[in-house]
Regions:
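Flexible, glycine/small-residue-enriched loop-and-beta-strand segment within the central core
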Residues: 1-65, 92, 100-101
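C-terminal/domain-terminus segments
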Residues: 61-94
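Short amphipathic alpha-helical segments
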Residues: 85, 101-102
């Protein structure tokens, strides 16, 4: 977990091994300076994971993202956009493939 601003994880969220969560990016404006020495971009972003959600192994959650309650994020998925409540999202980038309540 690499958070510069805000992370909210609801109750009974299951994080599988090797899940990576971040709300910031690295600067990359000068090709003569290594990325690690260019600083971190903080844009007031917030990551939120709703209660009862399950985040699969090796999933990556990046940026200003809200994962709703009782969601399933598939293994190896890269979440870059919001996932509504009760949805299953998979892939890179992750996309919703099912609404559990439907």
């Amino acid at each position: 977990i690499s958070i510069a601003n805000s992370l909210d994880i609801g109750e009974q969220v299951l994080l599988s091994p090797n899940v990576y969560i971040t709300d910031c990016d690295h600067e990359y404006r000068n090709i003569d300076v290594s990325v690690i020495n260019q600083g971190i971009v903080q844009r007031g972003q917030k990551v939120s994971i709703g209660g009862g959600s399950y985040i699969g192994i090796n999933a990556v959650i990046v940026g200003n993202v809200k994962i709703g309650k009782h969601c399933v994020i598939g293994a190896n998925s890269v979440v870059t956009k919001d996932v509504p409540d009760y949805c299953v999202a998979v892939g890179s980038p992750a996309r919703v493939i099912k609404n559990i309540k439907s």
